[in-house]
Every structure is written in C-alpha cells, then in structure tokens.
Amino acid sequence: RQRQMCIRDRACVAAASGMGAISSALWTIAGAGKHIVADGTLYGCTFALLNHGMSRYGVEVSFVDTSDLAAVKAALKENTCAVYLETPANPNLKIADIAAVAEIAHGYNPAIKVVCDNTFASPALQNPLALGADVVVHSATKYLNGHGDVIAGFVVGKADFIGEVRMFGLKDMTGAVMDPFAAYLILRGLKTLEIRMERHCANAKAIAEYLDKHPAVEKVYYPGLKDHVGHDIAARQMKDFGGMLSFEVKGGRAAG
C-alpha cells in the first residue's frame, strides 16, 4: 500500500513540493523552441509557470480547453512536446477525457508527452497512465500525505523518463529534492489513502447535493452531480468523483 502509486505507474521521483514536481517534469520535457498545449484551467502557480515562466526561456505555450478535443487537435504543432492537463481541474472541477486527449496527441506525434496533474483525484481514484497519459504529477501536500504537515510532490511515469527527471529536471534545474522526514510522513499517510478517499468522496457528494438545492447557490461544480458537463467522462475514468467541489452564490461577489 505504501508504494501503490509507484507500483501502478512503474516509477516515480519525489520532490519538495507539487510545483517542484511539475517544474522538474516540464523542464525535462521542454526547452527553447518547443511548444506546449495546456488547459487554461489550472492550479494558479502552474498557470503562472506556463504563462510567465517558461516563455522567458523560449517555450511557446498555447492554452486551450482540453475537454474540447477539436481544440486540442487544432493546437498541436510540429514542435509540440507536451499536452498538459488537470482532471478534475482546480478550481472548477472540469473533466478532460484522458484517453481521448492521449489518442489525439500520440496520433499526431508519438513523441508528445501527455502530462496529467492527478492531485484532485489521487491514485486511489484515477490512474492516468492506464488511460494513455505518459507522465503524472501530484502535489503530495494534499491527499497523498493527508495530514496537513508536509509540502511535497511526485512525478510518475516510465522508468527511463523518471531517470531523466531525477538527474536533470530535479537535480540540475530546480533542486527541489524531498527531505527524508517528509518522505517518512508521506509513507505514513499513504497507508490510509484509500479509506480517506472513500470518506472524502462521500462527504463531497453530500455537500454538493445539499448546495445544489440551496436557494442562495447559483451553480455547483462537482463531477458527481449528473448535470455536471463532465459527469459521464468522470464516471468512466474515475472510481469515484473525488472530495473537491466549488460553487457560485447567487448575486456573485457582492452577495458573497
């Protein structure tokens, strides 16, 4: 159980933060003259890295809606090296069809790496590599640790690529090496990952259903609700719908 994430996904390397993991993976894949297709709905620091950081070093990034497969296909170029997505996405729980995105990207160029941030789902609910993704990144600060006392991240994928991340992206480019005590705490947390995720999912579903009927709530974003635009895809590629949700209040910011 302690190593279920790595066993399922072949190999992984630990980092000192989620952004350390993401940055290490992307710097291993991309460089000057390369192109990345990324979803426009991302964790804020990931968006900043792609939109402001990598462009300083000659990496072109095109932001698209990865739930729109035609948009993904149209954005691919000869120099595209990666397609980056989160599913479920932060903060609106948007769902992308991992298998379909991977089929499009690899059909265009087998060398393109499909990178999936699996933080909101965790390995207990979703295995992107089994769906066709090449690389999976996690912020272990959240579900994988589960106790709120660690900042950490993981990059997961084929052993040869993870070796490159370890020696170049992590060691040389970011230096975001996990400390031993953080590793110990995460191993502790992984023991209860599956049972914690069961409770997270049950709680989120109950809250989402309550908010969905609340007179002051305009819209609830939770893939477990049948009217969520990504419900059917989430039901197909996830074991359950996750523990995260967001919502809008009627009247917008002024009402909140």
Regions found by a protein language model. Give the residues of each.
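Conserved PLP-enzyme active-site core in the AAT-like
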Residues: 12-216, 221, 227, 232
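Conserved C-terminal alpha-helix-loop-beta "cap" of PLP-dependent enzymes
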Residues: 217-256
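General structural signal for secondary-structure boundaries
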Residues: 1, 124, 178-179, 251-253
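Short, small-residue-biased leader/transition segments that mark boundaries at the very start
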Residues: 2-7
